Curated annotation (Swiss-Prot):
Residues 1-108, 169-178, 240-521 are cytoplasmic. Interacts with dvl/dsh. Interacts with prickle3. Residues 57-67 have a biased composition (Basic and acidic residues). Residues 15-33 have a biased composition (Basic residues). It is found in: Cell membrane. It comes from Xenopus tropicalis. Has a role in non-canonical Wnt/planar cell polarity (PCP) signaling; can recruit dvl/dsh and prickle from the cytoplasm to the plasma membrane. Acts in a PCP complex to regulate the polarized assembly of fibronectrin on the surface of the mesoderm during gastrulation. Regulates convergent extension in both dorsal mesoderm and neural tissue without affecting cell fate. Regulates neural fold closure during neurulation. May be required for cell surface localization of fzd3 and fzd6 in the inner ear. It is a multi-pass membrane protein. GO terms for cellular component: plasma membrane. This is Vang-like protein 2.
Length: 521
């Protein structure tokens, strides 16, 4: 290595490392010219074992050989966490915005709950007020009137259950603007209830109407109107969006990961929330370590030329021509960076395949061991282990292979030792195979699979040129931003298809074999 390192007493050399060193020397001779003079002096301290097995700080797997890090931990002098005045200002702003969102959320819930309670109690009040105010003057309620009581009771129960299922659900997100259809429905219910109360106050309370059956029928009509409003709410809020009308493409700005979705008529803010719901289980987890090119490519310096004129003034034209020729020749030189990138990628793939094979073999052997222990436990009940103890017993045999594989694939920040133990315990408890255990680690999984501290974004920012309460249209583009990356969403309308019918008579499928002298039958 080019770095000045101090090796601990736990490091050792093996025959495999010598063969690996020969392979690495051949590769270094091929690219020695491009790498000379481009490396800076770095100081790396190798500490004795004593740190956690899966250290999140040691992610420099690309610069190590196959036996590096078996008993050591690399600690660099570079700080990965810093905070500035701008960060503090942004955090304060986020806290203020979250407080405003909480207030608006509670205000909307209070208004909706009050309106629902008013509309539910109004029919009951219509029937109770005459009994309380002028009970002696009311006409007797016959059989038909008593049957209306049953109708009102069941309709109110249906309305209560339907409203609870449709409106009183836990919100999935805080919207930056009011949900237009929900607000229109609330206004419609408010106007309906107020209109019924005005008519009830003028025509029934003031005149003290004695026809109690007519009053009950009036209350039944209000319940029927509320049921129709609830049906309208189901159509506008749930059924309208089911028919696909648009195709949206979601692209992550950093690594280019993309997905396509079909979606119906929704406002831009509701589409944004729907996309975020699908993002966490459709997109692979964002890993910024995979975005960097190899250091040999990034540190390569382009050669430059400086041309000085040392002659007289009359030689200025000649020197200018020579300098142009030199610069043109330098520009025609082919850059070998793609060769460097090719060899780096090939070496990385080779290392990943080798360490993957080691990990698979280690896990297979560990699971075979735990199955053998389970068979022995049936004979010796005194030595029975619970899943946690069994996971801890076999984890040591696969820990080194797991650590080196996660370092090579740059997945180490997303898998702690405790999370691996918990997953191993889960697999043992449910009698899962080694392949089922390795499924989480052999490739990047969806974002929701990892611990929320790794991916949780408290707030996303919706950036759109169109008002977010408008519905989707063809060509609409908006962005969902967070601190480290953003999701760019573009919209295309699903085209209209015109199909024509062409009838084919089954009797027309007749063929004739053409025989020639060379034809073999």
């Amino acid at each position: 290595m080019d770095n000045d390192s101090q090796y601990s007493g736990y490091s050792y050399k093996s025959g495999h490392s010598r063969s690996s060193r020969k392979h690495r020397d051949r590769r270094e001779r091929h690219r020695s010219k491009s790498r000379e003079g481009s490396r800076g002096d770095k100081s790396v301290t190798i500490q004795a074992p004593g740190e956690p097995l899966l250290d999140n700080e040691s992610t420099r797997g690309e610069d190590r050989d196959d036996n590096w890090g078996e008993t050591t931990t690399v600690v660099t002098g570079t700080s990965e966490h810093s905070i500035s005045h701008d960060d503090i200002t942004r955090i304060t702003k986020d806290m203020e915005d979250s407080a405003k969102l909480d207030c608006s959320r509670h205000l909307g819930v209070v208004i909706g709950g009050a309106l629902a309670l008013l509309s539910f109690l109004t029919p009951i009040a219509f029937m109770l007020l005459p009994q309380i105010l002028w009970r002696e003057d009311l006409e007797q309620c016959g059989t038909a009137c008593e049957g209306l009581f049953i109708s009102v009771a069941f309709k109110l129960l249906i309305l209560l259950l339907g409203s609870w299922a449709l409106f009183f659900r836990r919100p999935k997100a805080f919207f930056p603007r009011v949900f237009v259809f929900r607000a229109l429905l609330m206004v419609l219910v408010f106007l309906l209830v107020v209109s019924y109360w005005l008519f009830y106050g003028v025509r029934i309370l003031e005149s003290r109407d004695k026809n109690y059956q007519g009053i009950v029928q009036y209350a039944v009509s209000l319940v029927d109107a509320l049921l129709f409003v609830h049906y309208l709410a189901v159509v506008l809020l749930e059924l309208r969006q089911l028919q696909p009308q648009f195709t949206v493409k979601v692209v992550r700005s950093t690594d280019g990961a993309s997905r396509f979705y079909n979606i119906g008529h929704l406002s831009i803010q509701r589409v944004a929330v729907w996309i975020l719901e699908n993002y966490y289980h459709d997109f692979p987890v964002y890993n910024p370590a995979l975005l960097n090119l190899p250091k040999s490519i990034l540190s390569k310096k382009m050669s430059g030329f400086k041309v000085y004129s040392l002659g007289e003034e009359n030689t200025t034209n000649n020197s200018t021509g020579q300098s142009r020729a030199v610069i043109a020749a330098a520009a025609r030189r082919r850059d070998n960076s793609h060769n460097e990138y090719y060899y780096e990628e090939a070496e990385h793939e080779r290392r990943v395949r080798k360490r993957k094979a080691r990990l698979v073999v280690a896990v297979e052997e560990a699971f075979t061991h735990i199955k053998r222990l389970q068979d022995e436990d049936q004979k010796n009940p005194r030595e029975i282990m619970d899943p946690r103890e069994a996971a801890q017993a076999i984890f040591a045999s696969m820990a080194r292979a797991m650590q080196k594989y996660l370092r090579t694939t740059k997945q180490q920040p997303y898998h702690t030792m405790e999370s691996i133990l918990h997953h191993l315990e889960f697999c043992i408890t449910h009698d899962m195979t080694p392949k089922a255990f390795l499924e989480r680690y052999l490739g990047p999984g969806p974002t929701i699979q990892y611990h929320k501290d790794r991916w949780l974004a408290k707030q996303w920012t919706l950036v759109s040129e169109e008002p977010v309460t408008n519905g989707l249209k063809d060509g609409v583009v908006f962005v969902l931003k967070r601190q480290d990356f953003s999701l760019v969403v573009s919209t295309k309308k699903i085209p209209f298809f015109k199909l024509s019918e062409e009838f084919v008579d089954p009797k027309s499928h007749k063929f004739v074999m053409r025989l020639q002298s060379e034809t073999s039958v």
